[in-house]
Amino acid sequence: MEQLPEPNTSVIVSKEKVSMTDLSALTAITGHEYAMFTKGQERLVIRGNEIMVDVDIEAAERLAGEGYKWSGHTHPGFDTNCLIASAGDKAILECFAHKTSVIYNSKGEFRTFER
């Protein structure tokens, strides 16, 4: 958490150092969303706030152009409603070549969603 001290901070780490389960645990602690993008053996993790991660269409297109895949993101909360992809989630996924991503809640439960 010290590498992501506040919303809108990001860090690049090696792939084996962080998983979506880790981000789910951070979400449970902070109440904030986190997004993870993977390129080769590195992962870009971005800390959001209580309602969103600040990745717009332009940023998503840039990340896709740099070769990143959207591994997934978290939604704060403990029920299955937290696992529903928003229209914004689907719009961001449209920027990437792959067709699916995942949403994790604060309990570590997840759901795969499509564009």
Regions found by a protein language model. Name each.
Residues 1-67:
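Glycine-rich short-loop/terminal segments
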Residues 2-4, 12, 54-115:
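Active-site-proximal loop/helix of nucleotide/amide-processing enzymes and allied scaffolds
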